[in-house]
Swiss-Prot record:
Pfam families: TIM. Its main location: cytoplasm. It catalyses: D-glyceraldehyde 3-phosphate = dihydroxyacetone phosphate. The lineage of its organism: Bacteria, Pseudomonadati, Pseudomonadota, Gammaproteobacteria, Thiotrichales. It comes from the Bacteria. GO terms for molecular function: triose-phosphate isomerase activity. This is Triosephosphate isomerase. GO terms for cellular component: cytosol. It comes from Francisella philomiragia subsp. philomiragia (strain ATCC 25017 / CCUG 19701 / FSC 153 / O#319-036). The keyword Thylakoid does not apply.
Length: 253
């Protein structure tokens, strides 16, 4: 299966630094049939990034609202996402959930806004350290995915990418063990298999949580890991490019 390497730039960057970052990422060599690459800049820089990156690198928004338009100051709509030329969308990132109170219902409503379009939805799920230590991992992930798996058709679900990000490993430098990553990805795939086994086999499930160049090979080589959602390491072209290179090697060996 093609690996998917994505960079979530979060609320970082300036026109100058993003120009330098795009220049660096543009220099990476990889087989685009084996590896897909996408980045999620801050929305104010999307047009700049689209203009500066090669066309084969996807560009997405980090969030949208589920409202169509109107008096919702500060929000971005699905129509705006299309209008600026984005082809990816992050939905339900743990920071959206924890800092802004985003719920599973909100995630589902946002997904519904773009599920029948050409935009690739990346739905983020993950547990807190308390949930994992309390033995609630499977319950939490099942709940986070239930609305999506129960209400979308197989054809719609086939467009969805799931990003597993243990909340306790995001931006902390703490990385889940290889066993934890594989077991959790395998569990997520088993949830999808209850809907359709072929869907589960082909659905991309990527890992996010302090993924960096030094651990990329081991994590991306796991049988149920189809790529990565990279945070801090994606802000350095050399490191992000090395992760892309590692994915490319895995897919071509």
């Amino acid at each position: 299966m093609q690996k998917l390497i994505m960079g979530n730039w979060k609320m970082n960057g300036s026109s100058a630094s993003i120009k330098e970052l795009c220049k660096g990422i543009s220099e990476v060599n990889y087989n685009s049939e084996k590896v897909a690459v996408a980045v999620f800049p801050s929305s104010v820089y999307v047009k700049e990034v689209l203009a500066q990156l090669p066309k084969e690198i996807g560009v997405g928004l980090q969030n949208i609202t589920f409202y169509d338009n109107g008096a919702y100051t500060g929000e971005l709509s699905a129509e705006m996402l299309h209008d600026v030329g984005c082809n990816y969308l992050l939905i339900g990132h743990s920071e959206r959930r924890s800092l802004f109170g985003e719920t599973d219902q909100d995630v589902f409503k946002k997904l519904n806004k773009i599920i029948d379009t050409s935009v690739v939805p990346v739905v983020c799920i993950g547990e807190s350290l308390e949930d994992r230590q309390g033995g609630r991992l499977e319950k939490v992930l099942t709940t986070q995915l239930s609305l999506i798996l129960e209400n979308l058709s197989i054809e719609q679900l086939a467009r969805v990418i799931i990003a597993y990000e243990p909340v306790w490993a995001i931006g902390t430098g703490v990385v889940a063990s290889l066993e934890q990553v594989q077991e959790t990805h395998q569990f997520i795939r088993s949830l999808v298999a209850k809907v359709d086994e072929n869907l589960a086999k082909n659905m991309k499930i990527v890992y996010g949580g302090s993924l960096k160049a030094e651990n990329a090979k081991d994590i991306l080589s796991l049988p149920d890991v189809d790529g990565g959602l990279i945070g801090g390491a994606s802000l350095k072209a050399s490191e992000f490019n090395e992760i892309i290179n590692q994915a490319n090697k895995i897919c071509t060996e």
